[in-house]
Amino acid sequence: MDKRVYIFFTLFIVTIISHSQEKCDFDSFIKNEFPAKEKNFMEGKLNLKNINIGFIFFKPIRYLGFIDSKIKRRIDVKFLKISKSEINDSIYLAKGKTIVGKNTRLFEGKIQIRQIYSFKYISTGEEGEMDGIVKSQGIIIADYHFREDKKLSATGVFEGKVLLRWYINNKGVFSYDTINNFSDDYNNNQFIGTWTSYKTGVKKVANWGAHRIPCSGDLDIGAAEFMPNEKYYKYGWEDYKP
């Protein structure tokens, strides 16, 4: 192959990949995670009145995240309090904080459950250790809207959708789903959305999650676990440790 043609072809492919990464959104993420969604999903029947999903947001030891799809600046997210609404079983009130560089900002807002799906075929673990233990398994899709303090600089609004994985054991206990955490691409609590600056109105992609970051493109080059690409080290990832 002519060298010039090869270079052109390579650049063309890289451009397509980069473009597709920028276009990644919640719907495309779901399609990628569950390619046979229509075939393997059914509408869930969780009794929202009898369960409290608040604990799910505290299960991850830490959240991995980035803000701004161009430079993928590191953002650390931590929830401080999640409480179920007393008037609507699908709504949870949230308080937390974010750390971007040297800036720590508090936020508060709400998470509202929109859809519940159950899997037709449940997982039993790497060696079948969960066989007979899992009664049902599925995902929750919710909207979130978190507001930072307008009085502080570099603040705005986080909003988007979150994917939560759950299962119910044979004793009827609603649980955070770690059944497939042996898998290299295991993830949970996947937040996909934007951050909009109060001051400028500029909107930036802001995604975070447990174990992996959704729609992270070339930021994550790890095989068995998340590992940041060296090209993004200067945006807060240089001191990252698994």
What are the language-model segments listed below?
Residues 207-219:
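Short beta-strand elements
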Residues 179-185:
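Exposed beta-sheet edge/beta-hairpin loop segments within beta-rich domains
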Residues 22-80, 94-98, 121, 128-154, ...:
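Tryptophan-anchored aromatic micro-motifs
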Residues 1-25:
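Bacterial Sec-dependent N-terminal signal peptides
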Residues 81, 98-100, 111-115:
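A mature extracytoplasmic/lumenal domain signature
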Residues 111-115, 160-169:
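Extended lipid/amphipathic-ligand handling interfaces
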Residues 104-108, 156-157:
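Short, surface-exposed coil-to-beta transition loops
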